[in-house]
Amino acid sequence: MSSAIESWADAGDEFSVPADIIQNPDGTKTVITFRTNQDGKKVKITQKIKEVIVREKVHPLIAQRKNWAKYGKEKHSSPGPDTSTTQLGEKVDLKLGLSWKQVEKKEEEDKAQERASRVVVQTIKCRVCGGDHYTAKCPFKDTLGASTLNGGTPEPGSEGAGDADAVTSTGRYIPRHLRPDANGNIPTREARDDSTTLKVSQLNTFVDEDMLRNELFARFGPLQRVTVVRDRETGESRGFAYVSFATEEIAQKALDLLNGKGYHSLILHLEWSKKKKPL
């Protein structure tokens, strides 16, 4: 009884036939083999092979280094680098010369010309607001009125005057809260109430909002705001913070208890963020 075939590779070897190689007059050779496909049928495979010898010309020093004898653990290895022990890097062609400054200057000039070609020259100017669009498509045409279009100016204090102030000579839009009124005054937003805010200075750089809230000011009840002032570029603390309390009485109590106390190797200095008016 024949033994069971354990793998498909063994099954292929059982039906394999030695290859028939035919040398052709043109230097090629034809290899004919027989194999069994997935359906269990025996198929004939014909391959025409042409051997091409590629000769690469290298520098004599490179050829000399290839003939060096290997040593150490690679003493009995075959010629050439072994990918298991040698990491092959990318081939870099180094071109030496004295005109590298001229080449860099030319590259900079090409980049400058490319940037200049991308600049769009403004050829369209609106007669109403001066923007880079057609007058008929001006978004401020209805608000500025026909007087601006005809060369006149709206009367001060009118709705058209307020909208006209919203657009500068360059066509930039000015928000309403930043426009001057009829008297030339710029309205200001309501100032934030900092009457219960303390400025805490002389802090260590690693102190953050959570440390201030939990280690220093948690005993004084809920806090409205804790902000450590940081550098915009590095994000590192600048050594001071602002803490807002629920009432002025609680803030005064924290000022009296913590001012001049030590905290992480530094002496705290607490003061009101906004100067108090004398009574």
Swiss-Prot record:
Record bears the keyword Phosphoprotein: yes
Q: Where in the cell is it found?
A: Cytoplasm
Region (Disordered), start-end ranges: 69-90, 149-193
Q: PROSITE patterns, per this entry? A: RRM
- Family matches, as Pfam families: eIF3g, RRM_1
Nucleotide-binding among the record's keywords? no
**Domain RRM residues, every copy:** 196-275
Q: Which SUPFAM superfamilies match?
A: RNA-binding domain, RBD
The UniProt similarity line reads: Belongs to the eIF-3 subunit G family.
Q: What does this protein do?
A: RNA-binding component of the eukaryotic translation initiation factor 3 (eIF-3) complex, which is involved in protein synthesis of a specialized repertoire of mRNAs and, together with other initiation factors, stimulates binding of mRNA and methionyl-tRNAi to the 40S ribosome. The eIF-3 complex specifically targets and initiates translation of a subset of mRNAs involved in cell proliferation. This subunit can bind 18S rRNA.
> What is the name of this protein?
Eukaryotic translation initiation factor 3 subunit G
Natural source organism: Lodderomyces elongisporus (strain ATCC 11503 / CBS 2605 / JCM 1781 / NBRC 1676 / NRRL YB-4239) (Yeast)
Record gene name: TIF35
